[in-house]
Amino acid sequence: MSDTVPAPLRLRLCQVDYTRADQPWFYGHAWVVGDAALSAKRTDSYGQRFYDVDVRYPTSLVFVAGPNCGARGHEASSTTTRTFNPHAAANYALFRSGVKAALYAGLMAMAQLGTEVALLAHISAGIYAGTHKAKLRADFEDIVNELLEDTMCDSPSGPAPLGRYFHRVILTLLE
């Protein structure tokens, strides 16, 4: 969302004050854009990259908000200022749990959509990680596996691990 939107409207749309998030559940929300179409990216004979809108494939986009304890802007209206969480900055366990809550929300939304292939980003593992970056990157695959293996969901045949709802779960690479 643009920083040019007045603060009261931003607050109404977000409905979460992440600067005061002292519990992981503050990050347990997912926003879904269903029935989206993505296009293939191609290279023309001149080496220019372009989107080939004739080659589209359906997808659903799921967005989550992970904790920010590493980036803070200079202005009060800055997105990073409005999301910086000093509690998570001081407490790795809270930060990790917030990341896990965001991943949980996203994976549950994807399972409810019937998503076959879940493509996961490293939530909060870049500039938002701050001093926790190395530890989170080392823990990230374990966090995903904990959710896929240990989270039990109701199914017609009884409880099943969340991971059974997907054909594949792909964790993107960080560079």
Give the positions of each predicted feature.
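Macrodomain-like recognition of ADP-ribose-binding/processing modules
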Residues: 1-175
